[in-house]
């Protein structure tokens, strides 16, 4: 049985992704912060996890190593958006966002790297807000979130380069505007998310199980610009 680690698996895209992998016969190690993972399945192992806390990251990574001798996939889904309406860069919020969306991802991933073998897949959930090739930004909001996702994109490329010789595939994936708690933060009466978590989960599963090209940024099943 193949094993996947999914962070932030108690709601939204993470929950839908956990359900998708379980339905396909995978064992899922899912992490949650506060709310439990409301799935009844013998192949789900739920672990409480705080991605902003180095001690929690160290503890959870060791627990995962006790559970699994190898990993077939890691879905770095957990993240925060706390400056959606801010049009200035608040240093406190930027620092907090980087701790969760970048440092936490790097810390957990690096600790788990020994468990990955040829054809295993690491997926970093990203966003169009992390794209730096746009000639002009849409607006000045969410600076911390944008910065964090741009940094995560570079980590994705850097990691892909480092582990390519081991046959490990590393990808970034932007799920689009999804109907989740985070996605609805910026929704209005006239503009709302146009995708459901299950659609994003299908994209993630297809990426993990079919794509062999490493170091790419994916959106809606196609490669996109960094």
Q: What is the predicted function of each stretch?
A:
Residues 10, 14-19:
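N-terminal Rossmann NAD(P)H-binding glycine-rich loop of SDR-like oxidoreductase domains
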Residues 24-38:
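Conserved glycine-rich Rossmann-like NAD(P)H-binding loop of the short-chain dehydrogenase/reductase
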Residues 42-55:
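Rossmann-fold cofactor-recognition segment
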Residues 59-63, 85, 92-99:
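Active-site Tyr-X3-Lys motif and surrounding loop/helix of classical short-chain dehydrogenase/reductase
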Residues 77-83:
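Conserved NAD(P)H cofactor-binding loop of Rossmann-fold oxidoreductase domains
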Residues 87-91, 95, 118-165:
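Catalytic loop of short-chain dehydrogenase/reductase
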Residues 165, 172, 187-226:
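C-terminal helical subdomain
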């Amino acid at each position: 049985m193949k094993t996947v680690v999914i962070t932030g698996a108690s709601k939204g895209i993470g929950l839908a992704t956990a359900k998708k992998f379980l339905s396909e016969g995978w064992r899922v190690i899912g992490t949650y912060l506060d709310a439990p993972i409301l799935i009844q399945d013998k192949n789900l192992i739920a672990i409480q996890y705080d991605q902003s806390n180095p001690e929690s990251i160290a503890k959870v990574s060791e627990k995962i190593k006790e559970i699994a001798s190898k990993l077939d996939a890691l879905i770095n889904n957990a993240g925060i958006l706390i400056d959606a309406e801010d049009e200035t860069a608040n240093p406190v919020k930027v620092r907090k966002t980087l701790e969760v969306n970048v440092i936490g991802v790097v810390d957990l991933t690096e600790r788990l790297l020994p468990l990955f073998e040829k054809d295993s897949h690491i997926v970093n959930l990203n966003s169009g807000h992390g794209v730096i090739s746009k000639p002009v930004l849409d607006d000045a909001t969410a600076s911390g979130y944008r910065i964090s996702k741009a940094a995560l994109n570079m980590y994705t490329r850097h990691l892909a380069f480092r582990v390519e010789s081991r046959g490990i595939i590393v990808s970034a994936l932007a799920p689009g505007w999804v109907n989740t708690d985070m996605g609805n933060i910026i929704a209005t009466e006239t503009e709302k998310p146009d995708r459901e978590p299950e659609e994003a989960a299908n994209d993630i599963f297809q990426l993990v199980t079919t794509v062999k090209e490493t170091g790419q940024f994916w959106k809606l099943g196609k490669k996109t610009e960094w």
